[in-house]
């Protein structure tokens, strides 16, 4: 049981207590259900790869988004990973294409632009006649570094913008940090 708990703890957002609860829950399930769970996990790992165009997770050579003829072709939204892409898709506000970088520039972790899918992004911009790139990267040192790098690299080819950052709905101004408030002021829009 300790091995199972240890494996669950390796998952993002799962602490020791949750890992133990998950392990106990699985051990109380019928053998057939545990086999189905294991089969689904193995099938996902072997059958799901990356879209050859945008690098989003896909069981096919091209993902659903890239195959969709109703998506706008001239706009690419750049994200760090598929989790960010899925979060944006849940809003149903963006109707263009995506490009998954595979991470963010982080010199402290030894991750430079050459380890990300930057070359592929530049190739897409020149091959697909992209007019705008929207950078939807995390508001962090790494996200800012990556945005600055990409902005400088891509501006000669197309319009480059970054999504606005500010206060989450329902939050109180007095509890917001200075950086968040500064960005909220910078990203203000007319009413």
Swiss-Prot record:
- Span of zinc fingers (C4-type): 51-66
What is the documented function of this protein?
A: May play a role in DNA repair. It seems to be involved in an RecBC-independent recombinational process of DNA repair. It may act with RecF and RecO.
- Family, per entry: Belongs to the RecR family.
Keywords attached to this entry: DNA damage, DNA recombination, DNA repair, Metal-binding, Zinc, Zinc-finger
Q: Which domain of life is it from?
A: Bacteria
Q: Residue limits of the Toprim domain?
A: 74-168
Species source reads Synechococcus sp. (strain CC9605)
**Name assigned to this protein:** Recombination protein RecR
Which Gene Ontology BP annotations are present?
DNA recombination; DNA repair
The record, for HAMAP family, names: RecR (MF_00017)
What molecular functions are annotated in GO for this chain? DNA binding; zinc ion binding
Q: Which gene encodes it?
A: recR
Zinc in keyword set: yes
Pfam families recorded for this chain? RecR_C, RecR_HhH, RecR_ZnF, Toprim_4
